[in-house]
Amino acid sequence: MVKQTTEMNDASYLFNTGAGFNSQDYLGCHLAASGRAVFRVWAPHAKAVGVVGDFNDWQPSALKLLGATGIWQGQVPNVHAGQLYKFQITTPTGQVQLKIDPFAQQFERKPGDAAVVVEPMTMRWHDSLWLARRKKSRAANRPINIYEVHLGSWRRHLDGSYYTYAELAAELIPYVKQRGYTHIELMPVMEHLLDASWGYQQLGYFAPTSRFGKRDSFLSFVDQCHQANIGVFVDWVPGHFIRNYDALYQYDGTPTFEYADPERANNRRWGAWNFDLGKTQVQSFLISSAEYWLDQCHLDGLRVDAVSNMLYCDYDEGREGQVNQYGDNRNLEGIAFLQKLNTTVLTHHPDILMIAEESSAYPQVTGSVANGGLGFNYKWNMGWMHDTLDFFMMDPLYRHDHFNLLTFAFVYMFDERFILPFSHDEVVHGKKSLMHKMSGDRYNQFANLRTMLTYMAAFPGKQLNFMGSEWGQFLEWRDWSALEWVDLKDDLNHRMQQFTTQLNAVYRHNRPLWEQDHDPAGIIYTHTDDPDSSTMGFIRQAKRKYSFVVAAFNFVPVERQDYRIGVPYRGRYELLLNTEAQAFGGTWTKLETTFTAVDKPYRGQPASFTVTLPAMGALLIRPVKVIGGVKHAR
């Protein structure tokens, strides 16, 4: 047990008691005056610890154990930024092994895994206006339209080499801004060795990957995103870590970061080791990592990966007997850790977002910790995603028999605060791209995709789409090569990209599509019970009485003449979007752009108007001047 021999705010005490939320400022390598550096590492069961690196010809400089803290410390001369180093650990059995610095802020390029000595962070930020606006606005009441990106395959040079952070800033940021997205979500940028892991088996929890450049170049990328009014989320993996023996596994020769029980430690599904989330030092390590990315790197939020794996003792492992003291399979340490993580982070940064990728039916993922919830701001709506894809993959001839795939989500849409995700996981490993999933010939695949993305934009919840879907890339995603940008030479792909740009603009500039995403008052059900026609309609309502958007969908390739739509008020309405417009790759050369609602009740609404509902298409319509209303009430 660690004894408190100094003040309560002593860094070693805080780290050991699970309250060290900036432990990277204490542990790791820290340059001091006169070319010296202080090295500290937690290795509680080691017999001896040294540091080796370029500064001592890789001959160990001994560190001393600080009492009962489990932390080893030493000051080493002739240390300069850019030099490589590792810790040399002598295990309880006398084995000598080289280990990474868990708190390193930069690593050498793979295949090496030595840490790099870095200068203290001196980044001059230029995003004060962005941060000020972020503090003033509530996420629930603003548009969130996320472009998910794998930096290693968004673009590559002709020789196959990666774009640097600087090159990505020069091309990715203007592209995302032009397309109209509000945020970028980066698949993990934390240092990792295996490209095929996509970053989800992490080596460095405080280090942007060196594949694309140095730490400060990554910070500049984030800064430039904010200057362009684009938020940045990053995927973060606090549940499991890379198997490599020279990383965190058996760090001091005993289970240090992972569970002591080998069954609980071994994550067979992903070939990784599970963190012991009940260990206070591990809590300090992981929460410090989250705080580092949010505070020091100015990220706008973290998408926490594989939350289900942390909620259950035996998640997707097929093992029996993994139970808690209450006899069920809830991972009580994992649940408590997530509550502590979100409470800590959101207390320090109330304007950022913590997003859960959680695929089970665990309750109250976005509920408050005080009421027993996990405390996340958002949860990915995996059920909506799977059901929606299953519906659009189906031959339209059979959709009327499976309309529940769409309507079931209406039952639980407000149980959590949801993000609707068409992510990287759905376009890889033989699952096909979004475009390739769509039913029908090439023309109808584009029509289906336009309709599905419009359905997503109109449905309550924030939204996320993976790169390449915006133009309907046919090939599924491959992490080892760039997107198929050549597709844009094809007229249909080019028009699909223009459609996505317009849809994003309609979404962003119309409050009803996002202002009340998590409030039942944000949707009026007008036509959700007609499976025989395979059509659907509903109204998205903003807080202002006369600010709403009418959404109508036709999920079969049969045009509906004189299709009646019920609305709350008589008066004049205008078209926002017709997915079958020729400009988007459809067949409509002349669009109905205005509609007049009369006092003819329909489907529970006092007024109505008729439209021609395009085959395999969707319409978004808003009021212009209604009785008692105002023009363009957005």
From Swiss-Prot:
Highest taxon of source: Bacteria
Gene3D superfamilies: Glycosidases, Golgi alpha-mannosidase II, Immunoglobulins
Signal peptide: none
Stored InterPro entries: A-amylase/branching_C (IPR006048), Branching_enzy (IPR037439), GlgB (IPR006407), GlgB_N_E_set_prok (IPR044143), Glyco_hydro_13_cat_dom (IPR006047), Glyco_hydro_13_N (IPR004193), Glyco_hydro_b (IPR013780), Glycoside_hydrolase_SF (IPR017853)
Alphabetized Pfam families for the sequence: Alpha-amylase, Alpha-amylase_C, CBM_48
One function term, GO molecular function aspect: cation binding
Role this protein plays: Catalyzes the formation of the alpha-1,6-glucosidic linkages in glycogen by scission of a 1,4-alpha-linked oligosaccharide from growing alpha-1,4-glucan chains and the subsequent attachment of the oligosaccharide to the alpha-1,6 position.
Oligomer status and interactors: Monomer.
PANTHER family on file: 1,4-ALPHA-GLUCAN-BRANCHING ENZYME
Protein name: 1,4-alpha-glucan branching enzyme GlgB
Species in which this protein is naturally found: Lactiplantibacillus plantarum (strain ATCC BAA-793 / NCIMB 8826 / WCFS1) (Lactobacillus plantarum)
